[in-house]
Amino acid sequence: METPLKAPEGSLGSYNEPSSCTSEQDAAAQGLVSPGDEILYQLYQPLEACDNKCYCKKCCYHCQMCFLNKGLGIWYERKGRRRRTPKKTKAHSSSASDKSISTRTGNSQPEKKQKKTLETALETIGGPGR
């Protein structure tokens, strides 16, 4: 013979007690709503999105979700990634390729020619003063 399983004495309680998932209207209809039960009902309410955009003190403490989001600044929603700016058009890079190498690199060769001409000019003048 098998014995039926008994629930432990410290389990969820008797079946006569209203559960936390019953609605407030059901609890009010039963007449079992006390201030403590109402607070517990509000505490165990599921976190639902709140459409209120106000950040005043009253609205920050409106519900647990508002407190987390507005009061503490914790957002569990997925943030959208920023999109990268599109690369510049091909016309810009093609204009750089039209220029010669010396103009893109800062005219390094013409500077060398200028230095050589200055050196030759100084030699023809007569060198140092003495």
From Swiss-Prot:
Pfam families: Tat. Residues 79-91 have a biased composition (Basic residues). Residues 13-25 have a biased composition (Polar residues). Gene3D superfamilies: Tat domain. Changing C59A: Complete loss of P-TEFb binding and reduced Tat phosphorylation. The modification Phosphoserine is found at S94. Transcriptional activator that increases RNA Pol II processivity, thereby increasing the level of full-length viral transcripts. Recognizes a hairpin structure at the 5'-LTR of the nascent viral mRNAs referred to as the transactivation responsive RNA element (TAR) and recruits the cyclin T1-CDK9 complex (P-TEFb complex) that will in turn hyperphosphorylate the RNA polymerase II to allow efficient elongation. The CDK9 component of P-TEFb and other Tat-activated kinases hyperphosphorylate the C-terminus of RNA Pol II that becomes stabilized and much more processive. Extracellular circulating Tat can be endocytosed by surrounding uninfected cells via the binding to several surface receptors. Endosomal low pH allows Tat to cross the endosome membrane to enter the cytosol and eventually further translocate into the nucleus, thereby inducing severe cell dysfunctions ranging from cell activation to cell death. Through. This is Protein Tat. It comes from Human immunodeficiency virus type 2 subtype A (isolate ST) (HIV-2). The lineage of its organism: Viruses, Riboviria, Pararnavirae, Artverviricota, Revtraviricetes. The gene is tat.
